Amino acid sequence: MKISKWAYSIEEGPIEPVYVYEAPVRFWHWAQCAAFFMLVITGFLIGWPPIANYATTWDTYFFGNIILLHLVCGMLFAVLMLYRIYWAFVGNKYSRMIFILPFWDMEWIKGIFGTALYYLFLNKHPKEYVGHNPLAQTAMCLMYVLGSILIILTGLGPVSYTHLTL
């Protein structure tokens, strides 16, 4: 089986099993997913806090724990993203797929449009890829990688003011 260098398409030969997603990438995926959902849940509770005026402040420190959990999950989210960037350098060639978009490779660009046509039911037979297809690779880079970086940068902004409250 021959795999193209940048588009990761199967060019010729019978399909064989390929070890694409290593254990550290799988761990990162599920840990990042858990941190993200905890950030969503705690962020929702921070935005629309529960009513807690039925006891003293000491007894109802529930909201403070929500903010602490949100802060811890945000830091975990940032550390996991740094870990994933590190693994893109030391992992196999498929671990850097979502970080490098090979716009210089015409086969990869054609793969974006070919996959989009298949998803729109305009093409009957998709091209086979190892790992992510070019359209998924582009979507993950733009929405996940850049989105995560923006989430981290905007989330760390409020943390810089915590020294004022001490």
Regions found by a protein language model. Give the residues of each.
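Cytosolic juxtamembrane amphipathic/interface segments immediately preceding
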Residues: 13-24, 62, 123-132
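Alpha-helical transmembrane segments and their helix-start/interface "positive-inside/aromatic belt" motifs
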Residues: 20-35, 136-142
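Alpha-helical transmembrane segments of multi-pass membrane proteins
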Residues: 39-51
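Perimembrane loop-to-helix junctions flanking transmembrane segments
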Residues: 53-66
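Hydrophobic alpha-helical membrane-embedded segments
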Residues: 69-100
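Membrane-proximal soluble regions of multi-pass membrane proteins
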Residues: 92-127
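Loop-to-transmembrane boundary segments
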Residues: 119-146
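Conserved small/polar residues in nucleotide/adenosyl-binding loops
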Residues: 162-166
